[in-house]
Regions:
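Hydrophobic faces of well-ordered beta-strands that scaffold small-molecule active sites
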Residues: 30-34, 54-56, 79-83, 124-126, ...
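N-terminal signal peptide c-region/cleavage motif recognized by signal peptidases
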Residues: 21-23
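Substrate-binding cleft of extracellular glycoside hydrolase catalytic domains
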Residues: 72-120
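Bacterial N-terminal signal peptides that target proteins for export
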Residues: 2-13
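Active-site beta->alpha N-cap acidic-glycine motif
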Residues: 26-91
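C-terminal domain-boundary segment and adjacent tail
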Residues: 148-158, 217-280
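Active-site mouth loops of central-metabolism enzymes
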Residues: 30-34, 95-105, 184-189
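Catalytic domains of cell-wall/extracellular-matrix polysaccharide-remodeling enzymes
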Residues: 104-196, 201-203, 213-234
Length: 280
């Protein structure tokens, strides 16, 4: 009888320990994408010196786009085409961007030219694009050519009524959404706060995708934050998320959080001065 109880207790402890360990060491995934690569050599270099899991989004029209593509590939970063797209405002976008009213042939041509400049890209995200990503016709043309080019799509969510994700799924293109903007404000404390928001979002939802820019405060926060990343958070590249069959993040194991999104931009997402136009 004593042996029976000892065995039962031992098995219970082993089971409980395994369950606790599985919960304790489950890691949230944090993906970081740095937009606007290709304009500033110094800042771009600091981004490329970060761990390879930090993904880079290169603007095809940027003067150093081809060079950055090769450097990022050499250093094993996941690369995105940061495609200029028409905003709701009248801000001029870079040459070769996507605007309302383009024909399907024109969209195809511009995407192919962008891919030729950034040939190692595995996906695309939008630079501005609050008008473009809300336009069903334009997004249908875009997702069709992205499927043909075997490119994924990351919706930067510059407007709440974006149809990019819906149409991408209809067209068979793997798509994910941005969750947190790291540097809507370039203030150091604000960037630090947004980085912590991304960590909390990853803990709650299992996955967080944060977008930032090659600015001094953003670089400083990321260097320190990545170096001291909590044990329960795993830094991952965008490719690993896109290729994962389970694109939608799993529900939290225990619902102890408020159902309030991480503090990022709020609809309509447009009044973000530091995200407008050609990067400074």
């Amino acid at each position: 009888m004593a042996a029976f109880f000892q065995s039962a207790v031992k098995n219970t402890i082993i089971f409980s320990t395994a369950l606790f360990s599985a919960f304790t060491f489950a890691q949230g995934k944090l993906a970081i994408v740095i937009d606007d690569i290709g304009y500033h050599p110094k800042e771009d270099g600091e981004v490329l010196a970060m761990p390879k899991e930090v993904s880079v989004a290169i603007i095809p029209a940027a003067p150093y786009a081809k060079i950055r593509n090769q450097e990022a590939k050499t250093q094993n970063h996941d690369i995105l085409i940061h495609m200029p797209m028409q905003p709701v405002s009248n801000i001029k976008i870079e040459e070769g961007g996507l605007t309302l009213g383009l024909s399907e042939a024109q969209v195809n041509d511009r995407v192919k030219k962008a891919k030729a400049i950034v040939p190692n890209a595995i996906g695309m995200n939008n630079h501005m694009g609050s008008a473009a990503t809300a336009d069903t016709t334009l997004m249908t043309y875009l997702m069709t050519i992205l499927r043909e080019q075997n490119l994924f799509f990351l919706d930067s969510r510059t407007i709440g009524k974006s149809v990019a994700g819906k149409i991408a799924k209809e067209q068979g293109v793997r798509v994910l959404d941005r969750h947190v903007f790291l540097d809507d404000s370039d203030n150091l404390a604000d960037v630090q706060r947004q980085f912590q928001s991304a960590i909390q979002y990853a803990r709650k939802h299992g996955t967080a995708i944060a977008i930032g820019h090659p600015r001094p405060n953003t670089v400083a926060v990321l260097k320190a934050g990545i170096k001291n990343l909590p044990d329960d958070i795993q830094l991952v590249g965008m490719g690993s998320l896109w290729r994962n069959e389970k694109i939608l993040p799993p529900k939290p194991f225990i619902l102890i959080f408020n159902d309030i999104p991480a503090p990022t931009s709020v609809a309509p997402f447009e009044p973000i001065p530091l995200l407008r136009g050609v990067p400074r």
